[in-house]
Amino acid sequence: MSLHRTLRRFLRKWKALVYAVSFILLIQAFFTFQSSPNLMEEEHLRRLKELQIKKHQELANSMLQGERALVHGRDKLVLNPRDPGFREEFFKHSNNEINILEDHNIGQVDKMEKPVLKPNENKFEEIHFATEKVPEIIVKYQPKCDITIKDSISALSRATTDRCKQQIADAACKMQDGTLFPKSMPRTCKHESKFTFDAPMPTSFDPDIRPVRICYMLVVHGRAIRQLRRLLKVIYHRDHYYYIHVDKRSDYLLREVLKETEQYPNIKVAPWRMATIWGGSSLLQTLLRAISDVLRIWKDWDFFINLSALDFPIEKDEKLVQYLSKYRDKNFMKSHGREDEKFIRKQGLNRVFVECDQHMWRLGERQLPEGITVNGGSDWVALNRRLCDFAVNGNDQLLTQLKHWYEYTLLPAESFFHTLVQNSDLCETFVDNNIRVTNWNRARGCKCQYKHIVDWCGCSPNDFYPSDLVRLRTSRPVFFARKFEESINQEVVNHLDFKLYGDYPPGTPALHSLWENALRVNSKMPSDCNLSVVSMLQVEMHKKDEEFVGYVVTFDAGWVGRRGAGDDPATSEDGSRVQLQAFLSPQPSLRILDRSSNLAKRLETASVGTNWDVKELVIRDWGGLVGPNSDVHLVARWSRSEDDFVVTVVVIDPLNVVADYNDFRTPSKAAGVTETPLSLKKPLRPGRWLVRFYVQRQFTNICAELDFYVTPQEFKGGIEGDSVLREINRGVVDDAQVNAANRNLYSIRTTLNLARNNQAETELASESNHVAGLKLRNWVDFVVSSGWKAKDACLVAQSPETWREAQPRRCFMPRQGTPNLCENTNWSSLSPDPKTELISVKPDGRIR
């Protein structure tokens, strides 16, 4: 009773307070209930998501079976993944909450990434689905604020898709209201300034130390499969791991990589692909995603080293393993080596960038976060497993904020890991050495050659030549160098390969030969009983002793009986087919006419092409294949001389009309290369063009002449028969309009007094009327064959019997010869090439 009376007195005295507290508790409970998750609704949504993912997996598995069949060359597919109806069904069920990973880039579905398909069981254990959420598909561009930043307005005016514009606008609005980035970030390193650990090469190695295992990530693109094979051959060891990411746009390379690496269980190809661009934020995303994969796939590697196909080792694997074993708790990154403020400005770290539509858009300036030190240098690194695990699985504030900050950063991979390590508890693991040498020639490598894909001027390293090998001598421990392109210079790669692992035996074939895939096309032609092309399979560039010698063309051919002109050779009476390779070589095009002239004494080579590499000083479209809409460059190589002089070149079109002229000076007191862009109005007239060389407008004396051919265009946007081809293949009609720079050509034409070829004009007008069919193809063949010749052919087979078995009896002739087998033909890409062949693992764990 006393307790009851006491409680009553308490309530009378504090009644108002009790009511107030009770009211507050009720309000809190109400809002808690309103904001708490609806468990039944969440369960319902979870089940819907599971059903949706299951449907995706079923469709992806169906697609996988079809892709497997394509990869292995099966004719009878369970389901054809190239069928637009099937792919439409697959992507129809896509939800933008599920980011399906990309496959072989078949089709033009750009709303989301597509599913990755596993060609064999050794490569992928499952079809992976990304966990990150992709942005909603924007139907209409709607900025959320009035954008006033000049750079952002410029980016919006140049972006083409609504989705990209929306990304730019969203970032710009957050920039303007100051919410895009945190003003400061936490620093947990106990050192006030940047810390660097010195890791010299030990004079001796402890044999009792457990050797490290390395996980190599190879980021590859293009078509140089042989160079990639050669790199794998020299860095391979059964104790290491290899994870290969093939660029989303390199379908040919992906197929070849999958085929070449099947026999090695410690090599995996990424089941996802990204289309990375120079300087793009996607480069860092690719690295982090790969690190996440290899952490999950392999549990016992110690170091992560990223390479490209343009890298090559300069020390043996054993020495690298010994060095890293000594410093297994360190991280190797190259710092910029200049003042921080200067590096930040040159790197664009004080600017905001957004990547979309395969472009890095500059949106404006930003302040660097307070509290941390921003560091950077090279994006080629060697990271220990502890840092890798922290970078992808950590969740502290510094890491989370840095990842967000670098989403809007140019060249993020060149700075992210440096900044993360220098400001975290791992700062004492930083070694200012990325264990490689890069061949920089900034006078040639910093030409703003990436302005078409990034709103910034950047630099790119140069290829190594034998004369650059002296740069490999450094005071710091280095184990790799870059860049090497065998299509530019193979001798330097041979030198390093032979130095590390010894010369190949005398008589080894193809040591100084190179083949590189250039093209895959389809072609069909009618024929009688002669052997006829059924389908062209691929074209490979061929170099020998550092010189381009031609193209190797692989094609299916068949014997076709007498049929109508429009019949398909593939439907011959007996279906007999063989596979052949043909060697096509360009005809000599440079003629020296006055060998006594100074020009003739110095001019070594001259050629015309369309893909001029300002950094390496070469034309990359080997053979000078020019079309009506090509940008044409004249490139000449000159020997050394004490005297220089002015060269005049005059360009004459197929109608014998002067179309352009240029004056330039030869290199002074040195050998060198000159490049002259020709100002020719498009479309160019198809046929034979002529370039004449004079010494400083001495037009009475032609020193040299160079031919090049403009080939008629057969397709427009991949479609045959477009009526616009008539105008394209006719070329510029008015002689007064043939020069794109509107130069006054009257005096040159008057001086040379060339007779216009009116018959050629009549023939050109007649030929250009054909926009499809046999007559257009014959015209193309005629122009191409004027500058190219088929030198030889060989049989793609194990035995000559293949030819005799395939040849119909009605086409057999006594004493008829059989083509040589390609494997016995030195120009063939199927002939032995031991320096790039991947073989079985040897007892020492290597394949070289």
Swiss-Prot record:
Protein name per UniProt: Xylosyltransferase
GO molecular function ontology, one term from the record: metal ion binding
All ranges on the Lumenal side of the membrane: 36-843
Lipid metabolism in keyword set: no
Binding-site residues, UDP-alpha-D-xylose: 219, 247, 276-278, 379-380, 460, 482-483
One matching Pfam family: Xylo_C
Enzyme class: transferase
Task performed by this protein: Catalyzes the first step in biosynthesis of glycosaminoglycan. Transfers D-xylose from UDP-D-xylose to specific serine residues of the core protein. Initial enzyme in the biosynthesis of chondroitin sulfate and dermatan sulfate proteoglycans in fibroblasts and chondrocytes.
A GO term from the CC aspect: Golgi membrane
Taxonomy of the source species: Eukaryota, Metazoa, Chordata, Tunicata, Ascidiacea
